[in-house]
């Protein structure tokens, strides 16, 4: 799927970004290259291939370098919300920014 210049300008508008025509054309090229790469990856037949956490697992045994998931500190919501300008029912209140 290739984007058009109109698509890039619409996306910029929705993101509330000002973008000059030259920048939009440059971004169009970059996005289309990215989408081309994604299409190439999607075209690869991966049926029957087990997902890997580390591709090197195919060559050698890899020990997971992940730590045990354990609680190391207790978060006190009241202490964290005390400096906030507005809090209600444990939630931070912020001004409306999008209509």
Curated annotation (Swiss-Prot):
- Report the EC code(s) recorded for this entry: 6.3.5.-
Q: Which GO terms describe its biological process?
A: glutaminyl-tRNAGln biosynthesis via transamidation; regulation of translational fidelity; translation
> Can you tell which superkingdom this protein's organism belongs to?
Bacteria
Q: Does the keyword Magnesium apply?
A: no
InterPro entries given in the database record: Asp/Glu-ADT_sf_sub_c, GatC
In its UniProt record, a GO molecular function of this protein is: glutaminyl-tRNA synthase (glutamine-hydrolyzing) activity
Reaction it catalyzes: L-glutamyl-tRNA(Gln) + L-glutamine + ATP + H2O = L-glutaminyl-tRNA(Gln) + L-glutamate + ADP + phosphate + H(+); L-aspartyl-tRNA(Asn) + L-glutamine + ATP + H2O = L-asparaginyl-tRNA(Asn) + L-glutamate + ADP + phosphate + 2 H(+)
Q: What class of enzyme is it?
A: ligase
The alphabetized UniProt keywords are: ATP-binding, Ligase, Nucleotide-binding, Protein biosynthesis
HAMAP family associated with the record: GatC
Q: How does it assemble?
A: Heterotrimer of A, B and C subunits.
By sequence similarity, the record places it as follows: Belongs to the GatC family.
**What role is this protein assigned?**
Allows the formation of correctly charged Asn-tRNA(Asn) or Gln-tRNA(Gln) through the transamidation of misacylated Asp-tRNA(Asn) or Glu-tRNA(Gln) in organisms which lack either or both of asparaginyl-tRNA or glutaminyl-tRNA synthetases. The reaction takes place in the presence of glutamine and ATP through an activated phospho-Asp-tRNA(Asn) or phospho-Glu-tRNA(Gln).
Report what the protein is called. Aspartyl/glutamyl-tRNA(Asn/Gln) amidotransferase subunit C
Biological source species: Burkholderia lata (strain ATCC 17760 / DSM 23089 / LMG 22485 / NCIMB 9086 / R18194 / 383)
- Lineage, broadest ranks: Bacteria, Pseudomonadati, Pseudomonadota, Betaproteobacteria, Burkholderiales
